[in-house]
Swiss-Prot record:
The active site is at residues 50, 122. Digests double-stranded RNA. Involved in the processing of primary rRNA transcript to yield the immediate precursors to the large and small rRNAs (23S and 16S). Processes some mRNAs, and tRNAs when they are encoded in the rRNA operon. Processes pre-crRNA and tracrRNA of type II CRISPR loci if present in the organism. The keyword Transcription regulation does not apply. Residues 4-133 form the RNase III domain. This is Ribonuclease 3. One of its GO terms (biological process) is mRNA processing. Residues 158-226 form the DRBM domain. It is found in: Cytoplasm. It comes from Rickettsia typhi (strain ATCC VR-144 / Wilmington). It catalyses: Endonucleolytic cleavage to 5'-phosphomonoester. Keywords: Cytoplasm, Endonuclease, Hydrolase, Magnesium, Metal-binding, mRNA processing, Nuclease, RNA-binding, rRNA processing, rRNA-binding, tRNA processing.
Length: 227
């Protein structure tokens, strides 16, 4: 496990209460072993962090996208707080190197498990909120999510809807999605999905069916528009 200084540098925030940081990084697998120093895990913080993230992302969108209607704002928010986006943020922070977990969880692939990375990212947001205030947390989220705020159109944040609308307008055919295969352990499976519109097909993979479908829709839409 890495020291916390590098993580705090990436965050742009230094914790006053390091125990909050430790709790946010502690995997629930630690509960079963008395010899571990930490008797708390990230689950409660994750619960709070999910709510804080949703609130602040909503506020940021409300202020920055003044001309967007509620429906479009809701779609953008769904994209910004979805598992895939949160995992990307957590991966850029290299959170897998900081998660405190049992050897058994690590051997089972726990450090690369998208669920763990998502959970720790949300727990970390809650820890920052409790250690500081809503304004500081707002600024950190705005910085970490900055590149995702550059959405240009529906394709960026809702490729499945964009593909469906394009397909209906161009060919009167709805996209058809099919799960081709699932590989890997139950907690870290990789899904391969095919999407088809008329005679065009696209295959993509993801850590969830939803992620794979979004990737496939985005790639196929790009092909169709440039064909």
């Amino acid at each position: 496990m890495e020291s916390f200084e590098k993580l705090e540098t990436l965050l742009g925030y230094s914790f006053k209460n390091k125990e909050l940081l430790i709790e946010a990084l502690s995997h629930p697998s630690l509960r079963q072993y008395h010899e571990y120093k930490y008797d708390k895990d990230y689950e409660r913080l994750e619960f709070l962090g999910d709510a804080v993230l949703n609130l602040l992302i909503t506020e940021i969108l409300f202020k920055n996208f003044e001309n967007y209607k509620e429906g479009n704002l809701a779609k953008i928010r769904s994209y910004l707080v979805c598992k895939e986006t949160i995992c990307i943020v957590g991966t850029k922070l290299a959170l897998k190197d900081y998660i405190i977990m049992t050897h058994g969880e690590e051997v089972a692939g726990g450090r690369d498990n998208p669920n763990n990375i998502e959970n720790v990212t949300e727990a970390l947001i809650a820890a920052i909120y409790l250690d500081s205030n809503i304004e500081i947390t707002h600024n950190i989220i705005e910085k970490l999510w900055a590149e995702f705020m550059k959405v240009q159109n529906l394709t960026d944040y809702d490729p499945k809807t964009a593909l469906q609308e394009w397909a209906q307008a161009s060919s009167n055919h709805l996209p058809i999605y099919r799960l081709i295969k699932r590989e890997g352990a139950a907690h870290s499976s990789i899904f391969t999905v095919l999407v088809k519109v008329k005679d065009y097909e696209q295959i993509c993979t993801g850590y969830s069916i939803k992620e794979a479908e979004k990737k496939a829709a985005r790639c196929l839409l790009h092909r169709l528009k440039n064909d």
